[in-house]
């Protein structure tokens, strides 16, 4: 049954990227990347959209472009920890039911894709929801940077119940492989539990934070979408985002 959920969209952002310094403020067609992400997250209309950052520079830039930001501590080990602090500050009375965590390096993400991340929480029993795309490029099947989802099909193959996430090529045998998109929607209680657990053995081995939830018995459902949004981790990725923007006239 479809639930009516009070939702908060949070975008964690920090300046500490080693591969691409000052990444959130990188210019794409005259606008900082973090602002492109905020524009698209706001267009998804999943409640209030707030950037959670430890950088006063990011805070000021975001505010200058008309978006809301909140300062968080600088010692967080993950974006999940940062958004939990932001949630506690923004909603101390506990009125928010679900939190959508949009990564700050997805400047081309479709607002509809963001909306779809919430669906497994609205119409199913999942604790956490995320996104996946069927892999169609052969090289991606063996690329450890393309995280694969091992899961059981649900809802006519448009959704998976996640059993595992891995950098290896899995599952073995005939059939589709799915690329995990690191955008999450959490029930509030699930986020609270998740950040209190601490890193798990498989999480540390695979370097995949979502395995912490699975090892603790939490349910993650994956909504299957059609395209992978461009994630900006390197200068080459940034160049692609700029090319996309210049060709499209806008992101």
Swiss-Prot record:
GO molecular function, a single term: 3-deoxy-manno-octulosonate cytidylyltransferase activity
Gene Ontology biological process: CMP-keto-3-deoxy-D-manno-octulosonic acid biosynthetic process; lipopolysaccharide biosynthetic process
Keywords, in A-Z order: Cytoplasm, Lipopolysaccharide biosynthesis, Nucleotidyltransferase, Transferase
EC supergroup of this enzyme: transferase
Protein location: Cytoplasm
Pfam families the record matches: CTP_transf_3
HAMAP family (UniProt xref): KdsB
Annotated protein name in UniProt: 3-deoxy-manno-octulosonate cytidylyltransferase
UniProt source species: Brucella abortus (strain 2308)
Name of the encoding gene: kdsB
């Amino acid at each position: 049954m479809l639930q009516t959920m009070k939702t908060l969209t949070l975008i964690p952002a920090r300046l500490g990227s080693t591969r691409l310094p000052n990444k959130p403020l990188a210019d794409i067609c005259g606008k900082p990347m973090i602002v492109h992400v905020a524009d698209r997250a706001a267009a998804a209309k999943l409640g209030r959209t707030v950037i959670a950052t430890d950088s006063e520079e990011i805070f000021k830039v975001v505010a200058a472009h008309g978006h809301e930001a909140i300062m968080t501590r600088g010692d967080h080990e993950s974006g999940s920890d940062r958004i939990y602090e932001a949630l506690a500050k923004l909603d101390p009375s506990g009125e928010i039911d679900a939190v959508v965590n949009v990564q700050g390096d997805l400047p081309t993400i479709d607002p509809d894709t963001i909306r779809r991340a919430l669906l497994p929480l609205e119409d199913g029993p999942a604790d956490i929801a995320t996104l996946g795309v069927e892999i169609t490029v052969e090289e991606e099947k063996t690329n450890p940077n393309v995280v694969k989802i091992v899961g059981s099909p649900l809802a006519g193959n448009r959704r998976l119940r996640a059993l595992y996430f891995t950098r290896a090529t899995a599952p073995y045998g005939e059939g589709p492989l799915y690329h995990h998109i690191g955008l999450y929607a959490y029930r509030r209680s699930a986020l609270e539990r998740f950040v209190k657990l601490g890193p798990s053995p498989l999480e540390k081995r695979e370097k995949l934070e979502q395995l912490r939830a699975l090892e603790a018995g939490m349910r993650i459902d994956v909504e299957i979408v059609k395209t992978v949004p461009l994630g900006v981790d390197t200068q080459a990725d940034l160049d692609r985002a700029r090319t996309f923007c210049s060709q499209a006239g806008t992101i």
